[in-house]
């Protein structure tokens, strides 16, 4: 099943009645053929649905209102086949709440030089009509993506596909509930933020849930369920045979981890939550035999299922990871929540070890993860605990984070290169080693100047284009650190953005 089967993107063609009935028929036929071609290309993750040609203000308004009210519709593509006077789009655009992609293309690829007459030129006026439509969108400060290119070409289809994935991620976030088991880690600034503004701007609804409530679900988990999940662990992951010895402490720790996973999944499903956070200083009543350490293995596996996760109460990362996972569906290389841990200064190959105490998603593993039990001496409960151990794939990727700047949210994106790490025999955790682009000095320096977190959401498959589209839809700031970044220019960008986002509130 396609992960995006529940969604549609609507295609609306712009024209007018000035050119006569034959033109109206031709526009409709061409539009149908284009939409069928887009769907049959095999390049688009979301079905395109042709919603007809709009020839008047009332028709525009009707189709955009319908888009707003259709839960399956996650975005709208507009294309002007003929000249379509843009004042007729004003009322509809004022009401459109779904993401907008303006496709500047043409039914025919090339000009038929020997046969083109005035009728042909009047019919095929995308060069004319799309500029008119673009003007009114800009005049109205309508945020949208503009894709320019022939509709059958690979690059055009790729840009539409990127937009569709972002629209799906955006739609998913509009009813996103994040559950915080406990509060944020004390005295940490960057994981905090304005939850009211986050819901207004990005759709995130963040609720506190006392760990005592989670423990009630934990108590209800049957031993048979736990035994079955432990058997699944042993089937899916490499492990020492001794780990299956039920008389050992190590087996008991695996069993405890399985019960924690079942309890967290149960409460998330009961509440309809799409993500959660934990805090190693809030693990429930010590008098009840609940969590003996942070539920690291549970967090790893739940991330792989698609639940957002943030450590130490980091609800913004939990929400963002869920969006990353949705956008990443059907792409091959995987994604994870990660944390900057340790620097490795090695000249041009200077890098950052990405890890966490336990919670790294196995979707990015280079090989089959290994189930192990080791001591974790941090937080309110210091104990042996189960986890999946692996290193990440080698290759390029992109990592992102959202920070609260006080007057706005800032999305920070950094291109990275994951490289092969040396063995870590004394550090039994999942990890990745990457070089932030353009190098550690500039990449890390720019990230710090932007106020970036130590937590981020990483994907091998997503690129900065996805995040640019996301920021455009959300109406938030985005800064991109890449191979061309210099500290001098990046500082200027941050300063200009500071002024822009203060003045922009007066324009909206």
Descriptions of predicted regions:
Residues 25-41:
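Short catalytic helix/loop segments, enriched in acidic residues and glycine
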Residues 60-73, 90-92, 261-270:
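Short, well-structured alpha-helical segments in soluble
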Residues 45-48, 104, 109-244:
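Cap/lid and interdomain-hinge subdomains that line or gate substrate/regulatory clefts
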């Amino acid at each position: 099943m396609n992960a995006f089967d529940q969604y549609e993107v609507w295609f609306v063609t712009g024209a007018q009645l000035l050119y006569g009935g034959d033109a109206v028929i031709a526009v409709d036929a061409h539009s149908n053929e284009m939409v069928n071609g887009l769907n049959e290309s095999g390049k688009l993750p979301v079905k395109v649905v042709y919603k007809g040609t709009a020839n008047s203000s009332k028709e525009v308004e009707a189709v955009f209102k319908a888009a707003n009210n259709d839960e399956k519709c996650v975005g709208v593509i507009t294309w002007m086949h003929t000249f379509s006077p843009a004042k007729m789009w004003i009322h509809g655009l004022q009401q459109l709440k779904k993401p907008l992609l303006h496709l500047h293309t043409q039914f025919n690829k090339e000009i038929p030089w020997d046969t083109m007459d005035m009728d042909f030129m009047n019919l095929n006026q995308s060069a004319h009509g799309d500029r008119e439509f673009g003007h009114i969108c800009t005049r109205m400060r309508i945020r949208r993506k503009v894709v320019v290119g022939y509709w059958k070409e690979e690059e055009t289809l790729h840009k539409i596909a990127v937009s569709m994935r972002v629209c799906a991620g955006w739609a998913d976030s509009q009813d996103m509930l994040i559950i915080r088991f406990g509060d944020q880690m004390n005295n940490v600034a960057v994981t905090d933020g304005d939850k009211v503004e986050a819901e207004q701007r990005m759709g995130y609804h963040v609720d506190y849930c006392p760990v005592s409530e989670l423990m009630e679900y934990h108590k209800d988990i049957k031993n048979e369920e736990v035994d079955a999940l432990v058997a699944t662990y042993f089937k899916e992951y490499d492990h020492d045979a001794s780990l299956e010895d039920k008389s050992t402490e190590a087996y008991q720790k695996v069993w405890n981890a399985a019960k924690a996973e079942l309890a967290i999944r149960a409460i998330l499903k009961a509440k309809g939550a799409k993500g959660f956070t934990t805090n190693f200083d809030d693990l429930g009543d010590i008098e009840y035999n609940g969590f003996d350490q942070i539920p690291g293995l549970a967090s790893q596996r739940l991330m792989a299922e698609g639940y957002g996760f943030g450590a130490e109460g980091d609800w913004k990362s939990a929400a963002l990871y869920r969006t990353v996972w949705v956008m990443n569906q059907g792409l091959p290389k995987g994604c994870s929540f990660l944390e900057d841990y340790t620097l490795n200064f090695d000249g041009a190959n200077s890098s950052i070890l990405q890890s966490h105490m336990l919670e790294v998603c196995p979707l990015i593993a280079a090989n089959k993860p290994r189930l192990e039990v080791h001591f974790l001496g941090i937080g309110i409960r210091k104990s042996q605990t189960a986890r999946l151990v692996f290193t990440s794939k080698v290759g390029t990727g992109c990592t992102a984070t959202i920070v609260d700047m006080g007057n706005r949210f800032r999305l920070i994106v950094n291109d990275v290169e994951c490289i092969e790490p040396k063995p870590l025999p004394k550090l039994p955790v999942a990890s990745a080693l990457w070089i932030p682009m353009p190098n550690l000095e500039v990449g890390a320096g720019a990230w710090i100047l932007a106020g970036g977190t130590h937590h981020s959401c990483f994907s091998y498959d997503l690129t900065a284009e996805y995040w640019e589209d996301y920021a455009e839809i959300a109406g938030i700031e985005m800064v991109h650190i890449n191979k061309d970044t210099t500290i001098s220019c990046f500082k200027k960008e941050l300063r200009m953005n500071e002024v822009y986002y203060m003045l922009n509130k007066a324009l909206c």
